[in-house]
Amino acid sequence: MKSGSRRAAASCVRFRIARGTNLMDLATIFGYLLAWGALGYGAWHASHGAIAAYIKPGEILLVGGCALGATMASMPLHSIIGALKSFKKMLFSKDAHIEHLIKEMVGYAETARRDGVLALETVAREAPDPFLRRGLQLTIDGTDPEIIERIMRIEIESMLERHKHGKHFFASLAKFGPGCGLVACLTAQVAMFRNLGGDAAVIGAALAVALVGTLYGALLQNLIAGPIAEKLGLKSKEEAFAKEIILQGVLSIQAGNNPRVVEMQLMSFLSSGQQAAMPKAA
């Protein structure tokens, strides 16, 4: 194996280490801790420590079950399974550093420029990203650039379509939450009105249950499903952004562009601050 191929393969290993570490999405975790911590303190303060007044298992089952059932009824089973996988991926996502990705693509361009495109064959086999692996292999095979772009573009669009199902699941759950909270509220109010003229304590307890049901619906929308749907949408855009960089890098390598040109082209995806922080290719 040529020295250029060995260097590219070693670079690929470093890329695998940088991208392959599963990290809990700290922003998601800290965000939920902050939101629920603030809610818990507010409820504790408002109830003078009687936090148990906000815990109604029956209402949790009613609101959660109704919202989940309505969401499942609106989607096919494979989309629901995909949504759960997307949620797991959101929590334990691979930290893809765009700056590092650009650096690796420039390294591949240097190898192809110096030793020929065929020198990337080892890199293509060992590339950790299947999308990158396919792009490099198509380049090595001498595939027409228009066909390469068409194949890789279809894969990006298919990925985005799959991600839409994951976002749709949690967005639907958020949409149905307040309505199901209203159902819980009305259900409790029926019991309350049946006891009008009776024990005031019973009426008060029924009214409290009604309000808690409404609260659960709002929480499901704003502190559970809604943020997940938004985060899934953001993650999808980030992944598509990284794949677009890979696509443009592969096409530039296939065209035989100078590594400096490849670097400048891919750097245009970054902000001026990110560009200034990146070391220039030799």
Language model regions located:
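N-terminal amphipathic/basic-hydrophobic helices that include classical n-h-c signal peptides
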Residues: 1-23
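Large intracellular
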Residues: 12, 20-22, 26-31, 38-166, ...
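Helix-termination/interfacial motifs at the ends of transmembrane alpha-helices
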Residues: 30-33, 37-51, 157-235
